[in-house]
Amino acid sequence: MDKIIIKDLLIQAVIGVNPGERIIKQNIIISVTAYKDLSKCGSSDNVIDTVSYSSLSKSICSYSESSHHYTLEALATGVAKICCLGFGIERVKVLVQKPGAIKLAKWPGVQIERTLDYFKSNSFVEIPSKLINNNKNSNNSNAGNNIVYLAFGSNLGDKFQNILNSFKRLEKQCFIQSTSFMYESSPQYYREQDSFYNCACKVSTDLKPHDLLKFIKQIENDMGRVETFRNGPRVIDIDIIYYNGLIIKTDDLEIPHPLMWERDFVLLPLSDIAPNFIHPTLHITTNRMKLNLPNGGNIHNIPPPPTATTTCNNIIEKVIRIGNLNYNWNDKTFIMGILNVTPDSFVDGGKFNTLEKSIQQATALIEQGADIIDIGGQSTYPGAQQISIEEEINRVVPTIKKIREVLGNDIPLSIDTLHHQVAKEAILAGCNIINDVSGEFRVPIILNHSQPTTQYLQQKQNEQYLNNSNDSNSNSSINTNGEDNNNNNNNNNNNNNNNNNNNNNNNNNDDNDNDNRSKIKQKIDLSSPKIETCTKLGLFRWQIILDPGLGFYKTYEQSIEILQRGKELMGLGFPVLIGPSRKGFIANTIANAEKDKSLPPPSPKSERRLWGTIACCCIGSMWGANIIRIHDIPEIRDAMLISDSVNKPQRRYQIQK
């Protein structure tokens, strides 16, 4: 067992029972000896597995200086609780001394010893602290600007819709500023019930704490919640987690929520929207509490909370609603089949641009294994004719309506468009997913699907094909800075072998901070403000899907880099879609790998591009891509069945023979 010693922290705090001691801060000296097994850190070299001396010291100081204890023992107990529950310390000794207590005493003090198991099994142990707003008649000086974090749960009926309905009712008195992802979690405290849907949201309100509690209880009652037994099933459950930074403890309300620290179904959603919010009594962030969960807050196989009676591990996973159906992102890699109702798309132009043929193809895509159909009415390859918005609507809307008529309402449909007018008409016709950031419709959207306008592509300075003249229909790789790509023509590669700027071995240098810098870094930098804009416009976090836009505004090396480092994009927490299907960067990667540099890149309809697409999809699946957008369903579906069996063994669906 490793020992961590923090000696003689000098702080000033309000402590004591006499009237004068409740006003003037006194010098307090705190020493801590903590015991924790850090062998895992030594073997993994992962700093998450160790204890930050600085963070622990700051938490102790912050807690002690802001709390108003009556006794040294109460303060020592509170410090011990922070060490154990906040930092995973297994055993701790806390010495608290008060030099100015009695003139003739040498430094009267109290020393206690506590364990992590003690606090887990005695969750009722109270940390005495300054109570704010501890009566129903409290006057809040921040009325109208109160920031509140709420947790939601439902496991009866249409669980997803129940939470959405509670949002609508909540908006009568609160403004929803942001939401977490939606999670599905196993029941923890009482196992014999259905799984829960959970999320969290940040709201602003002018309601005082007890008025807000009354309002929330009214929502629960109006939605049909019936009190049965503790931790039993419920139509809707809404808990106040934080209210500003207040500490409130009355007979009917306790803020912060007393058991939030052990609940993954609270901490994971809360960390989506308030990762750095500091718990006002534990004095640690939401992220720190999440990391203190067994398994470090990972979303699979989390051991049950300490106060639960079950020994079964908890499964908690992100879900999304598309149309009337709920999808679990970890079940499989979802396949989006491409349906272009255009005369000039680079792979299938003219094949499905009549209503009869488009319906036949949509039916075939579903039969072949597509989970989503992506419908496009405007080609974006270089040189494509730019059609009017009205013509694009006339191409896609009849197809959408006919698909709904023939195939029903359960098939998710996506509209691939640059124009919000087209997106609006497509949604009204029956689409479920759009590339629209207007927020007018609360449906899932795909962000960063970097499609340049046809006019942009047709500007001569931007026609930077990484293909030969016989491959004019392939997707282009475009450098948005208007600079030459490293490999504009594969036939010239042999002439540039000695040029370091064009050497393919140097293309993955992530330290170059030039105009041609890492596309992954650009995508992450650009995604965050777009995500923030979407949430401010009223979209829920679980409705956002990221697409790095393979092949658009990129050299082929940059598209390869995205495939190499896609896991970094996954680090944003959002589901990710990739669309490598038969694109030009695949052809150029193959051509550059050929010994005979005089060979032209494979054409869009070449089988070699199909094999390249399969490779890209398998790579994306390995780092966690959730959706793949493709033309060739049967071949890639089989590849994904194998890939998912390796990469997603926890999936719950059964592979059909």
From Swiss-Prot:
Keywords: ATP-binding, Folate biosynthesis, Kinase, Lyase, Magnesium, Metal-binding, Multifunctional enzyme, Nucleotide-binding, Transferase. Residues 1-116 are annotated as: DHNA. Mg(2+) binds at residue 340. GO terms for cellular component: mitochondrial envelope. Residues 467-509 have a biased composition (Low complexity). It catalyses: 7,8-dihydroneopterin = 6-hydroxymethyl-7,8-dihydropterin + glycolaldehyde; 6-hydroxymethyl-7,8-dihydropterin + ATP = (7,8-dihydropterin-6-yl)methyl diphosphate + AMP + H(+); (7,8-dihydropterin-6-yl)methyl diphosphate + 4-aminobenzoate = 7,8-dihydropteroate + diphosphate. PROSITE patterns: DHPS_1 (PS00792), DHPS_2 (PS00793), HPPK (PS00794), PTERIN_BINDING (PS50972). (7,8-dihydropterin-6-yl)methyl diphosphate binds at residues 380, 416, 435, 547, 583, 629-631. Residues 466-524 are annotated as: Disordered. GO terms for biological process: folic acid biosynthetic process; tetrahydrofolate biosynthetic process. Pathway: Cofactor biosynthesis; tetrahydrofolate biosynthesis; 2-amino-4-hydroxy-6-hydroxymethyl-7,8-dihydropteridine diphosphate from 7,8-dihydroneopterin triphosphate: step 3/4; Cofactor biosynthesis; tetrahydrofolate biosynthesis; 2-amino-4-hydroxy-6-hydroxymethyl-7,8-dihydropteridine diphosphate from 7,8-dihydroneopterin triphosphate: step 4/4; Cofactor biosynthesis; tetrahydrofolate biosynthesis; 7,8-dihydrofolate from 2-amino-4-hydroxy-6-hydroxymethyl-7,8-dihydropteridine diphosphate and 4-aminobenzoate: step 1/2. Residues 149-274 are annotated as: HPPK. Residues 514-524 have a biased composition (Basic and acidic residues). One of its GO terms (molecular function) is metal ion binding. Gene3D superfamilies: 3.30.1130.10, 7,8-Dihydro-6-hydroxymethylpterin-pyrophosphokinase HPPK, Dihydropteroate synthase-like. Pfam families: FolB, HPPK, Pterin_bind. In the N-terminal section; belongs to the DHNA family. This is Folic acid synthesis protein FOL1. Signal peptide: none annotated. Residues 335-657 are annotated as: DHPS.
